[in-house]
Amino acid sequence: MAVQKSKVTRSRRGQRRSHDALTAAATTVDVTSGETHLRHNVTADGYYKGVKVINK
């Protein structure tokens, strides 16, 4: 069983946790359809950078 050699201070614990925060997904609005979508991804209508790339 793992046992720490000494107590981890509040400062050290906070430094370790400083990278644990969640970030919001980067979204953008398509110029053609006006639909909100994830960056660098095709919209649900099949548009990417204003160009139709997938026919439904």
From Swiss-Prot:
Keyword tags: Ribonucleoprotein, Ribosomal protein
Bias (Basic residues): 7-16
GO molecular function terms noted in the UniProt entry: structural constituent of ribosome
Highest taxon listed in the record's lineage: Bacteria
A GO CC annotation given for this chain: large ribosomal subunit
Region of interest (Disordered), residue spans: 1-26
BP GO annotations: translation
Recorded name of the encoding gene: rpmF
Protein name, UniProt field: Large ribosomal subunit protein bL32
Family as reported in the entry's similarity comment: Belongs to the bacterial ribosomal protein bL32 family.
